[in-house]
C-alpha cells in the first residue's frame, strides 16, 4: 500500500497544478471578454474593489473521508473496506470556481488581448485531461484493491493476528490508532501497508484491517484490569493453518471454538473469528468431516458431553455476563470485501444468542469478554489423548477455516513466513482466567481422560509436549490410529504398576485382641499353613465393604438410612416421652384400665399390691394435662389418643382418682410399716437388757478398769472408778514391747484363764493329772477362750440396735400417724359424691380400715416411747451424767458393736497361739494311752530310757 499511496499523491498534485494553470488562462479570457462587454453606466466609485479573502489552502495530502457502511441486506454482502470517495479538488474544482468579480478593468487595460483560438484550446483540453487522469486513478485504485482482496482470500479471516494490525497493549493500541489516523475527532484513513502477524494460539496468516483490530470498550476494560506487558517480542510463525469462522464446529473434532468431547478435563482458550470459505475448501472440509464423524461413531463417543472450551461471539450482546479477568481478544477481517456485519450477527445467532445491536463504527469493532470456562463432567467414553484429538481435528479441516484450541501459554511451532520485513514483536500472552489452575488439568499425551485429580496434585500442562512438531500426515485416521496404538502400548507397559498401586477397598473392621507370637513355646497358630485357606476377595468385598463418612457419597448409597415413620396425629395431649413411659409401665403391670377403675371405685387393695399403686401414682398428670384430658372430645377432635392418654382419661373420669390411689397405697403399706416399727422397738428394748445383764461383758469391763488403773499409777488418770465405753476401742492401740501383743490381748488372756479355771473346776468328770500340769492349763485356756468368743452372740441384739437410726424411726411413726389424715380427707370428699353407686362401697372399706389403724398407731407410739426411755437409761447406766452430752441416742450400741468386732479378731489370734503351745507340749511330753498296760517290748523301752538319761546327764554337765 505505500506504493499506491505515493501514486495517488502524485496524481492529486498534478491535478491541482493543472487546475491552477487552467484557471489562470480562463481568467484571462474572461477578463478579455468582459472588457468587450463593459456596462454602459460604470460604477461611480473610483475606489479599487476589495479583493476577496483567499479560501483555505487545500492540504498537501488531502484526507479521504470514509462514509458509513450501508445497511446490510440478505442478498447483498457489504465489503469490509468501503469505497473511497475522492474530494472535489484539482482541475475540476478549478474549472468550477468562478472568477473573482470586481474591477479588473485596470488590469485588462494593461494586458494585451490574445487571439481567441489560442486561448479556447487549453480551456477545453485541460479539463478533459483532468477527468481522464482522475478516471484512470480511480480505475487503478479499484483494480489494485481487487487484486489485494483476491490475494488475501485465503488469509486468516477472523483469526487473531492474521492481518496487519499492530498488536500493542490495548491502551497503547488505541492511542496509536488515534495518532496515525488523524485523531479521534476527524475521519481517519486506514493504513495502506499490511503486515502479517501471528498471535499465540492462532494457526493462520491473514490480512487484517486496522478498523477491526481495535478492541471493544469491554475488552479495553478487561485488558486494563488484567494488565499486559509493554514488551513486544516476535514469535515464530505457525504452520499454514487458518482459523475457521466463528461458530464453525466440525462434528467430533472439537475445533472452531468448541473443545473436543474427549478432551477430558483440560481446558483450552481459542480466539474466535469469522471468515468466508471458498467452494472448493467447503467441499473438501465436508468430505473430511464426514470421514471423521464416521470414525468417531465407530468408536462410540460419549453422548451429551459438555463443551469445556468457551466460545467468544463477536457481538457485544452475545455475552450477558463477562468475566472480569479474561484476556481481550482481537479479530481482523481476512477477506476484505467479503466479511460483513451481517455475517457476524448471523454467526452469533447460530449459538442461540439474542440479536446483535446496530453495528459499531468501522474503526471500533467491539468484542465481549469471554465467559468463564465450564468444566466437563466425567463421561463413560473411552479415554483419549487431547493431543491426538486436536491433531485429528487439524487434519479434518482445511487450512483456511480451522480453529485449533491451544494452550495460551505454549508457543506453537514456526510456520513459513512471507512478511515484507521483520515483524514487530506481538504482545505477551494474556494471563489465565480466574480459577484456571484450580480446575482439573491433566497432562497432555496421557491416555487417561477419566482420571480425576485433585487441584493441588494436578500439574500444569507441560510446554515441551506441545513444542514437538506434529507429523504432517494427509490422512487424519492414520494419525489417530498411531496415537491409539501408542496409548495402548503405554497403558500395557504401566499396567502392572497401576495394579500394584491400586488401593484395596476398605472393609468393615473385626475387633479382636491380637496375641503376640511367642518364640519359646509351641502355639496352635504355628500349626496353620498359609495354603490351607484362601480368602475370596470378591465375595468379602461385596459383603463387608465399608463406606467411610469422608468419601464422596455414591449416586445410590449401598446402606440407606432408616426411614423414620411419619409422626401420627396421636400423643398430642401428653408429653411424648411421658406417654411412652406410661405405655411401657402399663404393659409391665399387665392390667387393664377396667380392672384399675373398678378397684379405685371400690377401694379394694387386696387384688393390687403396693407396687401397682405406686406405679399408678407416678402416672399422675399435671394440672394442665388433666384439664386437656378432661376437655378432650374424641368424637369431634381430629387427634387420636394413644394408649397412655386413653388410660389416664378413663382414670380421671373417677372422682378424685389419684387421691384414692394415694389413700389405697397407704392402706397397702400400713401393715408392713407397723410390723417394722414394732420389731425395731422390741430390738432396742432387748439390746438394753443384754447390756445390763451380760455377766461376761461386766467382767470384761472390770478387767479393763483394773488394768488401766495399774498402768495409770502415779498419774492423775489413776484410781478411776468408771470409764466411757469408747475406751474399749483404744485398747488395741496400746502395744507391748514385742510390737505384736496389745493391751486387749492381755485382757483377753487373763479373762480366758479365769473363765477356763472356773469351767474346769465345775467340770470334775475329767481327772487331773499331776504329771501334765501344762496340758491341763492349756485345756483351761481353750475353754475360757470359747466363753469370751461367745460374747458377740450374747450381745446380738446390740449389734442390730446399732444399725438403727432414731430419727428414721421417729419419722416413720409420724408418717404412719399422718396417713390417717389422708383417709379422713378421702372420706370427706366421698361424702360429696354419694350419689354414685360405688361411693358407698368405697366409704365402707375406708371406715373399716380407719378403726383398725387407729388402734395400731396408738400401740406403736406407746412402744416408741418405751424403747427410747430404755435407751436413755442404759446410756446413763454406763456413762452416768455424761449421757446428756451424747448427740446420737443410739451411739452406745454402735460403740459396743465396734468393740465386739475387735474382740472377735483378738480371740482368733489368741486361739492360734494356744494351739501352737499345745502342739509343742505334746512333742516334748508324750503321754501313753494307758499307763497301766504292760509294754510289748520292755527291753527296747529300757534301752531308750538309758539313752535319754545319758543325753540328759551330758547336757547338764556341759551347761555350766
Swiss-Prot record:
Per UniProt, what is the membrane topology? Single-pass membrane protein
* UniProt biased composition (Gly residues): 101-110
| Membrane as UniProt keyword | yes
Signal sequence span per UniProt? Answer: 1-22
Which subcellular locations apply to this protein? Membrane
One term of GO molecular function? actin filament binding
Which keywords annotate this record?
Answer: Membrane, Signal, Transmembrane, Transmembrane helix
Its primary localisation, in coarse terms, equals membrane
State the SUPFAM superfamilies in the record. Answer: Formin homology 2 domain (FH2 domain)
| Signal listed as a keyword | yes
Q: Which Gene3D superfamilies match?
A: Formin, FH2 domain (1.20.58.2220)
Q: Name one GO cellular component term.
A: cytoskeleton
Every copy of the FH2 domain together lies at 497-929
Put simply, this protein is called Formin-like protein 1
Organism of provenance = Oryza sativa subsp. japonica
Amino acid at each position: 500500500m505505500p506504493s499506491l499511496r505515493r501514486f495517488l499523491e502524485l496524481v492529486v498534485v498534478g491535478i491541482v497544478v493543472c487546475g491552477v494553470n487552467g484557471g489562470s488562462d480562463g481568467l484571462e479570457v474572461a477578463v478579455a471578454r468582459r472588457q468587450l462587454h463593459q456596462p454602459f453606466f460604470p460604477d461611480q466609485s473610483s475606489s479599487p474593489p476589495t479583493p476577496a479573502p483567499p479560501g483555505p489552502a487545500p492540504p498537501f495530502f488531502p484526507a479521504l473521508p470514509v462514509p458509513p457502511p450501508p445497511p446490510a441486506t440478505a442478498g447483498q454482502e457489504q465489503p469490509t473496506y468501503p469505497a473511497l470517495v475522492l474530494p472535489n479538488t484539482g482541475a475540476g474544482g478549478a474549472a468550477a470556481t468562478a472568477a473573482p468579480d470586481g474591477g479588473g478593468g485596470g488590469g485588462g487595460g494593461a494586458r494585451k488581448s490574445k487571439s481567441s483560438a489560442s486561448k479556447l484550446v487549453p480551456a477545453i483540453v485541460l479539463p478533459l485531461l483532468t477527468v481522464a487522469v482522475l478516471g484512470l486513478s480511480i480505475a487503478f485504485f479499484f483494480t489494485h484493491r481487487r487484486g489485494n482482496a483476491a490475494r488475501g482470500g485465503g488469509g486468516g479471516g477472523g483469526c487473531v493476528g492474521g492481518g496487519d494490525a499492530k498488536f500493542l497493549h490495548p491502551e497503547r493500541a488505541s492511542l496509536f490508532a488515534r495518532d496515525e489516523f488523524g485523531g479521534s475527532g476527524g475521519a481517519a484513513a486506514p493504513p495502506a501497508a499490511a503486515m502479517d502477524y501471528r498471535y499465540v494460539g492462532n494457526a493462520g496468516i491473514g490480512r487484517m484491517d486496522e478498523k477491526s483490530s481495535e478492541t471493544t470498550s469491554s475488552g479495553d476494560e478487561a485488558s486494563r484490569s488484567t494488565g499486559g506487558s509493554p514488551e513486544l517480542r516476535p514469535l515464530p510463525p505457525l504452520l499454514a493453518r487458518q482459523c475457521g469462522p466463528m461458530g464453525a464446529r466440525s462434528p467430533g473434532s472439537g475445533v472452531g471454538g468448541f473443545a473436543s468431547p474427549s478432551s477430558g478435563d483440560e481446558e483450552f482458550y481459542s480466539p474466535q473469528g469469522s471468515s468466508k470459505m471458498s467452494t472448493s475448501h467447503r467441499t473438501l472440509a465436508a468430505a473430511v468431516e464426514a470421514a471423521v464423524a464416521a470414525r468417531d461413531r465407530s468408536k462410540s463417543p460419549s453422548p451429551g458431553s459438555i463443551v469445556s472450551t468457551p466460545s467468544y461471539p463477536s457481538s457485544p450482546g452475545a455475552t450477558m455476563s463477562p468475566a472480569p479477568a479474561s484476556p481481550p481478544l482481537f479479530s481482523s477481517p481476512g477477506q476484505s470485501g467479503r466479511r460483513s456485519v451481517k455475517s457476524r450477527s448471523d454467526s452469533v445467532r447460530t449459538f442461540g444468542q439474542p440479536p446483535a445491536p446496530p453495528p459499531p463504527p468501522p474503526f471500533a469493532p467491539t468484542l465481549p469478554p469471554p465467559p468463564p470456562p465450564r468444566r466437563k463432567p466425567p463421561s463413560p467414553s473411552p479415554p483419549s489423548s487431547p493431543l491426538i484429538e486436536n491433531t485429528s481435528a487439524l487434519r479434518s479441516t482445511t487450512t483456511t477455516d480451522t480453529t485449533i484450541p491451544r494452550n495460551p501459554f505454549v508457543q506453537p511451532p514456526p510456520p513459513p513466513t512471507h512478511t515484507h520485513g521483520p515483524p514487530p514483536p506481538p504482545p505477551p500472552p494474556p494471563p489465565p482466567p480466574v480459577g484456571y489452575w484450580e480446575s482439573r488439568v491433566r497432562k497432555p499425551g496421557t491416555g487417561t481422560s477419566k482420571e480425576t485429580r485433585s487441584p493441588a496434585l494436578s500439574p500444569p500442562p507441560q510446554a515441551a509436549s506441545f513444542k514437538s512438531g506434529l507429523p504432517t500426515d494427509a490422512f487424519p485416521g492414520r494419525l489417530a490410529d498411531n496415537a491409539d496404538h501408542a496409548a495402548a502400548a503405554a497403558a500395557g507397559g504401566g499396567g502392572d504398576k497401576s495394579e500394584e498401586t491400586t488401593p484395596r477397598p476398605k472393609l468393615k473392621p473385626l475387633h479382636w485382641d491380637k496375641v503376640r507370637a511367642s518364640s519359646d513355646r509351641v502355639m496352635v497358630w504355628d500349626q496353620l499353613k498359609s495354603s490351607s485357606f484362601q480368602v475370596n476377595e470378591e465375595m468379602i468385598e461385596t459383603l463387608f465393604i465399608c463406606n467411610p463418612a469422608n468419601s464422596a457419597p455414591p449416586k445410590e448409597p449401598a446402606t440407606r438410612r432408616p426411614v423414620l415413620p411419619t409422626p401420627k396425629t396421636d400423643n398430642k395431649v401428653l408429653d411424648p416421652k411421658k406417654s411412652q413411659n406410661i405405655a411401657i409401665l402399663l404393659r409391665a403391670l399387665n392390667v387393664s384400665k377396667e380392672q384399675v377403675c373398678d378397684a379405685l371405685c371400690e377401694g379394694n387393695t387386696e387384688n393390687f399390691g403396693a407396687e401397682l399403686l405406686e406405679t399408678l401414682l407416678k402416672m399422675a398428670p399435671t394440672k394442665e394435662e388433666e384439664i386437656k384430658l378432661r376437655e378432650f372430645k374424641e368424637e369431634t377432635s381430629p387427634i387420636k389418643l394413644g394408649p397412655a392418654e386413653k388410660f389416664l382419661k378413663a382414670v380421671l373420669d373417677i372422682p378424685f382418682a389419684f387421691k384414692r390411689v394415694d389413700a389405697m397405697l397407704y392402706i397397702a403399706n400400713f401393715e408392713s410399716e407397723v410390723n417394722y416399727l414394732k420389731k425395731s422397738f422390741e430390738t432396742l428394748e432387748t439390746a438394753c437388757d443384754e447390756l445390763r445383764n451380760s455377766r461376761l461383758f461386766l467382767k470384761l469391763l472390770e478387767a479393763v478398769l483394773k488394768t488401766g488403773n495399774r498402768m495409770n499409777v502415779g498419774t492423775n488418770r489413776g484410781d478411776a472408778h468408771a470409764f466411757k465405753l469408747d475406751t474399749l476401742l483404744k485398747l488395741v492401740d496400746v502395744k507391748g514391747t514385742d510390737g505384736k501383743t496389745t493391751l486387749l490381748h492381755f485382757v483377753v488372756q487373763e479373762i480366758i484363764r479365769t473363765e477356763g479355771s472356773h469351767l474346769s473346776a465345775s467340770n470334775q468328770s475329767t481327772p487331773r493329772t499331776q504329771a501334765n500340769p501344762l496340758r491341763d492349763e492349756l485345756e483351761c485356756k481353750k475353754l475360757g477362750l470359747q466363753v469370751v468368743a461367745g460374747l458377740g452372740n450374747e450381745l446380738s441384739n446390740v449389734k442390730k440396735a446399732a444399725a438403727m437410726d432414731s430419727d428414721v424411726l421417729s419419722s416413720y411413726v409420724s408418717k404412719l400417724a399422718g396417713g390417717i389424715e389422708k383417709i379422713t380427707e378421702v372420706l370427706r370428699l366421698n361424702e360429696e359424691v354419694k350419689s354414685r353407686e360405688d361411693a358407698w362401697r368405697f366409704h365402707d372399706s375406708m371406715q373399716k380400715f380407719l378403726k383398725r389403724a387407729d388402734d395400731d398407731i396408738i400401740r406403736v407410739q406407746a412402744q416408741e416411747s418405751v424403747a427410747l426411755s430404755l435407751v436413755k437409761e442404759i446410756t446413763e447406766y454406763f456413762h452416768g451424767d455424761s449421757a446428756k452430752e451424747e448427740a446420737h441416742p443410739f451411739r452406745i450400741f454402735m460403740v459396743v458393736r465396734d468393740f465386739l468386732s475387735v474382740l472377735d479378731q483378738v480371740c482368733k489370734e489368741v486361739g492360734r497361739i494356744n494351739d501352737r503351745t499345745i502342739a509343742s507340749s505334746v512333742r516334748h511330753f508324750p503321754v501313753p494311752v494307758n499307763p497301766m498296760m504292760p509294754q510289748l517290748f520292755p527291753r527296747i523301752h529300757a534301752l531308750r530310757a538309758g539313752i535319754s538319761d545319758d543325753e540328759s546327764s551330758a547336757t547338764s554337765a556341759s551347761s555350766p
